[in-house]
């Protein structure tokens, strides 16, 4: 889908799509953005100011949502992403072979509901869910998610021939994801950017940055309040 943004309602997504540009002056459009958060999981071709093409997105749970639900299965606090990552450090990412839905699909869409269910079935079969087992489950789950995201980014780069990739959204704070996607630089001849940790989650600095950019453009700011606003309806 080709989207030309027209209103103030897109500030939330634009702040994440453009967040690395606050810190990396050399980053220029066009580029590929992997936007992963609690409410959104999509790969976007950022063509120019206000013009984006959604190349693929989750067909069910967002990545951050899946992290939170798996964290709940493991009796971890909310929000679960940080706690899953901490547990995974001491776990074996190959301990459990969780499903990786749509990893080999011809398109760039993703699915994390099946992966979440795979974890649930595993947890239900375990009588003693001790810390070591929790760490292995967390590491295996995190590895499965990142495998899917890395594979989709590789396909997006090949499809668009873009030389720059940015990772944005709350899940972009995950160090394992950062490391694995950063590894694509040498293997695929691309440059990978991600914002500082403080800019991964919603913050006023990013909104102000995007607002300053939008102030030089013509926007119709009439919009209705909605909890979630699909990018292709902005």
Which positions does each model-derived feature cover?
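Short beta-strand scaffold segments in enzyme catalytic cores
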Residues: 18, 33, 41-45
């Amino acid at each position: 889908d080709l989207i030309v943004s027209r209103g103030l309602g897109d500030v939330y997504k634009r702040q994440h799509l453009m967040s690395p540009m606050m810190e990396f002056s050399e980053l220029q459009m066009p580029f590929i953005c992997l936007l992963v958060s609690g409410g959104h999981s999509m790969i976007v071709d950022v063509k120019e100011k206000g013009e984006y093409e959604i190349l693929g997105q989750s067909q069910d749970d967002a990545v951050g949502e899946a992290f939170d639900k798996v964290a709940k299965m493991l009796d971890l606090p909310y929000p679960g992403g940080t706690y899953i990552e901490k547990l995974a450090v001491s776990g074996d990412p190959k301990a459990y072979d969780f499903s990786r839905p749509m990893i080999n699909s011809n398109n760039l869409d993703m699915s994390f509901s099946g992966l979440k269910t795979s974890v649930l079935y595993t947890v239900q079969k375990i009588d003693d869910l001790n810390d070591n087992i929790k760490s292995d489950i967390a590491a295996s789950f995190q590895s499965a998610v990142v495998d899917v995201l890395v594979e989709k980014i590789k396909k997006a780069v090949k499809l668009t021939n873009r030389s720059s990739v940015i990772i944005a959204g709350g899940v972009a704070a995950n160090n394992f994801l950062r490391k694995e996607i950063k590894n694509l630089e040498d293997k695929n001849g691309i440059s990978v950017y991600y914002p500082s940790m403080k800019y991964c989650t919603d913050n006023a600095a990013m909104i102000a940055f995007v607002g300053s950019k939008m102030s030089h453009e013509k926007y119709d700011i009439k919009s209705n309040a909605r909890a979630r606003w699909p990018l292709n309806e902005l």
